[in-house]
Amino acid sequence: MLSSYFAPGSIVLQDVSPSFEAAVAQSVSLLVGSGKANPEYVDEVLETLRVLGPYFAIAPGLALAHAKPSAAVMEPGMALLKLTEPVNSGSANDPISLIFSMCSPNVSDHLEMLGDFGELMSTEKVMNSLLNASAQSVISEILFKKAL
């Protein structure tokens, strides 16, 4: 279940970020702060962004920042940085205000997390609710399926 991947403090609302790369770094840093990954994982995700471009921007307003399963990851984890002022990633899905980050130590966890995330985010109601949410508690309720 998706909720088991989020640690306390891994959902943050923020007004602005100077760039998409900075927002990605901040979102992934939430995984480091929660003990799910080492600081090296931030570098791995940013390198993925530099090499592959803004493929993290997977839907209008939504990005899922991640790297391949890594030794820099201690346990599966997810985090979310929601920006009040969206940033441009350089993709057709701009502007981006929801920057999820994901980490996994192995392929099976990685695929399971992607499936859980895709299942939740596949409904327009969830997407719109997250995009319009203005409080951390509301976002938590949406993600953990209490408000839907």
Regions found by a protein language model. Give the residues of each.
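Cytosolic covalent-transfer regions centered on His/Cys nucleophiles
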Residues: M1-L148
